[in-house]
């Protein structure tokens, strides 16, 4: 997963080049979109051997690209090579090229989530002809797919739709950040505000100085409403065994949905 790339890139130059990589012919990654900066750095290091894919067991679709395709279409997760994709708005109307919407696929068979009929129902369109895992993205004129974020992670702050992945993609490659998560937390005036939770690199203190440095860095790349209102620090960002970010565990603490105490205030 891209997180592994980010962590490897933070190795010292000596550690990066102490092994003979001549037998390393292929590197395949998926599970989450890779920040463009990270992908470029990995290609510079390993060469044109990196392949990317996108797919979900439930969604009946699969996208793929090799290194050159990605360089020609930076940020893509690949071209759909299996399945029928539709990019739709909230009214189930097809969107034009380049405009983000929910990704829906035509199922080839039925599926259901174990002991979760509500989630199963939400994954299907009303006519049962399409299914989704609520990823948001768009396609370009060449048919390449780009992911924006998960719809369930979208932050609505003061009527503005904010996708946290954009901020995460900037934070994770930062030299003082080992891992990061960005999500919405309650705000009485705005509905939600942007929160960042950071796992600093070992030896780096999660203090006001680092917070100011990170916010200043983000302000050079993001519009004001996309910048976190606050940053908390944590010993370890929770991830699933696959490397996927366990964002719900972090969000639930702030929304009062469990008694998690994993965040250091």
Walk through the language-model features, giving the residues of each.
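Gly/Ser/Thr-rich phosphate-binding loop
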Residues: 9-73, 84-86, 91-94, 109
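Core-facing hydrophobic residues within beta-strands of well-ordered domains
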Residues: 21-24, 82, 177, 199, ...
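Hydrophobic/anchoring residues in structured secondary elements
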Residues: 26-29, 182, 232-233
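Beta-strand->loop->alpha-helix junctions that form or flank phosphate-binding loops
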Residues: 51-57, 77-79, 183-186, 232
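Hydrophobic beta-strand positions
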Residues: 86-87, 138, 238
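AMP-binding/adenylate-forming catalytic core of the ANL superfamily
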Residues: 91-94, 105-107, 111-112, 119-129, ...
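AMP-binding/adenylate-forming catalytic domain of the ANL superfamily
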Residues: 220-244, 263-265
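Acidic/polar alpha-helix N-cap and adjacent early helical turns
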Residues: 252-265
């Amino acid at each position: 997963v891209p997180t592994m790339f980010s962590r490897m890139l933070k190795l010292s130059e000596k550690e990066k080049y102490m092994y003979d990589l001549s037998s390393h012919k292929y590197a395949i990654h998926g599970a989450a979109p890779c920040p463009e900066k990270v992908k470029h750095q990995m290609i510079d290091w390993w060469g044109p051997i990196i392949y990317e894919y996108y797919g979900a067991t439930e969604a009946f679709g699969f996208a793929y690209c090799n290194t050159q395709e990605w360089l020609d279409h930076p940020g893509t997760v690949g071209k759909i090579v299996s399945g029928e994709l539709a990019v739709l708005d909230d009214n189930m109307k097809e969107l034009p090229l380049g405009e983000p919407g929910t990704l829906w696929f035509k199922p080839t068979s039925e599926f259901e989530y174990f002991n979760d009929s509500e989630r199963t129902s939400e994954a299907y369109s009303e006519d049962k002809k399409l299914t989704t895992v609520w990823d948001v993205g768009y396609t370009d004129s060449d048919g390449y797919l780009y992911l924006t974020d998960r719809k369930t992670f979208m932050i609505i702050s003061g009527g503005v739709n904010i996708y946290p992945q954009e901020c995460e993609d900037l934070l994770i490659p930062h030299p003082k950040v080992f891992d990061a998560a960005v999500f919405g937390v309650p705000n009485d005036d705005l509905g939600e505000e942007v929160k960042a939770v950071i796992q600093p690199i070992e030896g780096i203190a999660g203090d006001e100085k680092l917070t100011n440095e990170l916010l200043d860095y983000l302000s050079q790349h993001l519009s004001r409403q996309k910048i976190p209102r606050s940053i908390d620090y944590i010993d370890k960002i929770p991830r699933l065994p696959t490397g996927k970010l366990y964002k719900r565990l972090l969000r639930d603490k702030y929304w009062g949905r469990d008694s998690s105490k994993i965040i250091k205030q």
